[in-house]
Each structure stands twice: as C-alpha cells, then as structure tokens.
A protein has these predicted regions:
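Short, conserved turn/kink motifs that form compact alpha/beta structural patches or helix kinks used as
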Residues: 24-113
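Active-site-proximal polar cores
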Residues: 1-31
Length: 113
C-alpha cells in the first residue's frame, strides 16, 4: 500500500473542574497520527454501510487506513472523536467525526468517518 495522506486526531489538553466545582473548558489540539503521509483515504462511492456498536448501520463518507505502531495506540480515535483528514492531491481537507474503527492484523487501523 502506498500511504500518501495525512490523519490528525483531536485531543483535549485540559478540562475537568476547578476547586469550586465549576467546569473548566477544554482546550483542543490536533496531533499528527504517526507521521506525515501515514494513511490512505478512500471515498465511499457506492454508499456502503458499516454496522456500529449500537446496532445501527451508518453510510460513511470516507474510510481511512493508517499504519499502526505500539506508540500510536493511545492516539487511536474513539467513536465520536474528531479527526482531520488531508488527501495529498488536495481533494479532501476536512474535519470529520469518527463513527467506528477496527485494527487489522495489529499493523493497520481502519476508521469510518
């Protein structure tokens, strides 16, 4: 596989509550998942569906395949988390919500957005 696209994961740097119990607003930051050109982005041209954990089927917009290494496991985006995808040819540059993910042979991560 020729990995030419980029995947970034949105993570929260802070949040929680202050000493009076008031919520502290979270600050979000984009973290590169691995390195530049670590993923491949495919469009869902056939309106295929994926079954989610809640039992519903979802017609996804894109599927992303990314290289997975041990040090990237804490960065795996969870359902509902935002990711930023960028296709190397410039046709896709979007912020999307993760609908589901799986790991493949402990070497790759497959994400539906």
């Amino acid at each position: 596989m020729n990995f030419t696209d980029t995947l970034k994961v949105q993570t929260s740097l802070s949040g929680g509550y202050d000493e009076d119990g008031n919520p502290i607003e979270s600050i979000f930051q984009w973290i590169l998942f691995g390195k530049e050109k670590n993923s491949i982005i495919f469009t869902n041209e056939k309106a295929a569906k994926v079954s989610l954990n809640d039992g519903n089927e979802y017609v996804y917009s894109y599927v992303i395949i990314a290289k997975l290494k041990k040090d990237l496991i804490p960065l795996i985006p969870r359902e509902g988390q935002k990711v930023h995808i960028h296709k190397s040819d410039g046709t896709i540059d979007k912020e999307m919500e993760v609908k589901g993910f799986v790991t493949l042979k402990n070497r790759y991560l497959k994400i539906w957005v």
